[in-house]
């Protein structure tokens, strides 16, 4: 699952058993919330301290996603539910720019690039 929210971009997949290293079987009850920007995970933790505050942000240098949280799938489901309930805007990119400020300018530009790419996909269908 890819998730773009005002706090950042996350790729969420089933965690692997044990220490989560490659080659281990997946753990269907636990997910890895992966990010390319550490501050995105920190913002998510700050938004949901009661759910994610106790989770350590682990660094995996050289990995596709360098920063990760490991959480029970049920906790992640609650985070996503609350994110959905908190939608209070009519333009995601503009709301994200307001939330991120100058520090998040690169993320907002990346959102525009994703938007343009998906617009191209739509145009191929028309």
Q: What are the roles of these predicted feature ranges?
A:
Residues 1-126:
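Structured alpha/beta or helical-core interaction and ligand-binding surfaces enriched in interleaved
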């Amino acid at each position: 699952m890819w998730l773009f929210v005002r706090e950042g971009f996350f790729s969420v997949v089933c965690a692997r058993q044990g220490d989560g290293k490659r080659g281990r079987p997946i753990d269907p009850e636990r997910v890895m919330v992966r990010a390319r920007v550490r501050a995105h995970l920190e913002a998510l933790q700050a938004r949901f301290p009661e759910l994610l505050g106790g989770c350590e942000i682990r660094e995996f240098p050289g990995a596709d996603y360098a920063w990760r949280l490991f959480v029970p799938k049920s906790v992640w489901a609650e985070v996503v539910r609350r994110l959905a309930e908190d939608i209070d805007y009519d333009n995601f990119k503009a709301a994200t720019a307001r939330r991120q400020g100058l520090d998040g300018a690169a993320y907002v530009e990346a959102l525009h690039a994703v938007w343009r790419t998906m617009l191209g996909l739509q145009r191929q269908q028309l």
